[in-house]
């Protein structure tokens, strides 16, 4: 579902943001 995908995307964003130090 869209909700599930959105949750996954947000989780990925959090992981990437933590690695780069910057989150958009």
Curated annotation (Swiss-Prot):
Keyword terms, alphabetized: 3Fe-4S, 4Fe-4S, Cytoplasm, Electron transport, Iron, Iron-sulfur, Metal-binding, Transport
Cellular localization per UniProt: Cytoplasm
Annotated GO MF terms: 3 iron, 4 sulfur cluster binding; 4 iron, 4 sulfur cluster binding; metal ion binding
pH dependence: Optimum pH is 7.5.
Keyword Transmembrane attributed: no
Quaternary organization: Heterotrimer of alpha, beta and gamma subunits.
Free-text function comment from the UniProt entry: Electron transfer subunit of the chlorate reductase.
Protein name as catalogued: Chlorate reductase subunit beta
Organism of this sequence: Stutzerimonas chloritidismutans
Lineage: Bacteria, Pseudomonadati, Pseudomonadota, Gammaproteobacteria, Pseudomonadales
